[in-house]
């Protein structure tokens, strides 16, 4: 249950962060904004590491295997860039829908094929149908929502 709550908090924070980052980009540049996001995240993480008792030695990073797992930070820089770009291009709601939909599809494929050391999971029609329903849901043109007979 705590995992679900933390995931919900993460989703809410990501939505707010994306809007903040997009606004900073409008006033600076996308790479400067992305760099600031990464640097500020680094500072927060280092402070948290010091405050919480420094669990894990810095040298333990050299023992991470496989080494490509250390690319998470570099991927984070491109995530920051692409989120900022998409929010500026198509807005926060559309961006979130596409981002989350692709995350679900990719996560399912990673599990299905056992990529990156994740335990391989068997194919399940219900998961495939669920993914298809999500993709179909975002494929419906956004403008159709304005044609609704019920206006709230």
Question: How does the language model describe each region?
Answer:
Residues 26-30, 82-98:
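Structural motif at transmembrane-helix junctions in multi-pass transporters
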């Amino acid at each position: 249950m705590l995992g679900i709550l933390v995931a919900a908090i993460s989703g809410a924070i990501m939505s707010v962060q994306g809007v903040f980052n997009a606004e900073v980009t409008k006033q600076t540049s996308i790479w400067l904004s992305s760099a600031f996001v990464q640097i500020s995240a680094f500072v927060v993480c280092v402070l948290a590491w010091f405050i919480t008792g420094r669990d894990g030695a810095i040298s333990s990073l050299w023992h991470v295997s496989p080494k490509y797992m250390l690319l998470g930070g570099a991927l984070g820089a491109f995530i920051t860039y692409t989120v900022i770009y998409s929010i500026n291009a198509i807005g926060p709601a559309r961006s979130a829908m596409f981002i989350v939909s692709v995350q679900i599809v990719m996560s399912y494929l990673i599990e299905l094929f056992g990529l990156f050391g994740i335990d391989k999971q068997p194919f399940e029609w219900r998961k495939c149908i669920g993914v298809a329903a999500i993709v179909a849901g975002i494929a419906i043109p956004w403008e159709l929502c304005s044609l609704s007979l019920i206006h709230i």
